[in-house]
Amino acid sequence: MGENKGYITHVEELGSIHISEDVLASVAGTAAYEIEGISGLMHVTSKKGHARGVRVSVESDRAVLDLFVIVRYGFAIPEIAEKVQNAVISAVESMTGFSVKAVNIHVGGVSFNEKF
């Protein structure tokens, strides 16, 4: 597995698979948003200038995902964060075949609405 201009590459016997970092971010963000207690993702600017609540990097041929979330008031942040981490790892690994090294959760806000 390697990195090439915004894509994560996995070399297989039959050829290479290139998946955009934006795809990994989208999968991770969707998995996080499905967790009860998550109101939404914060808008952060990535190095490429795209606003999204997920940053993707590669360390030791494994994906590292940073998610910037807004938690609904009344939910235990540590429990929600762990649920998000597990959901993101499961979704990214099953949909892309790439290993996830870490999912770092950054809670940047609390919402009183169900979804932000």
Language-model segments: which ranges?
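Short, non-transmembrane amphipathic alpha-helical segments
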Residues: I77-T96, V100
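Terminal low-complexity, intrinsically disordered regions
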Residues: M1-E34, I38-K47
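A short interface-forming secondary-structure element
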Residues: L65-E82
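Short, highly charged C-terminal tails/helix-capping segments
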Residues: A102-F116
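A domain-level signal for the structural core that forms small-molecule/cofactor-binding pockets
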Residues: G2, L24, V58, F112-F116
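A short, local hydrophobic-aromatic micro-motif
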Residues: E36-S39, R52, K101, G108
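Short edge beta-strands and adjacent turn/loop segments
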Residues: S39-I70
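Short, well-ordered secondary-structure micro-motifs
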Residues: T30, P78, K115-F116
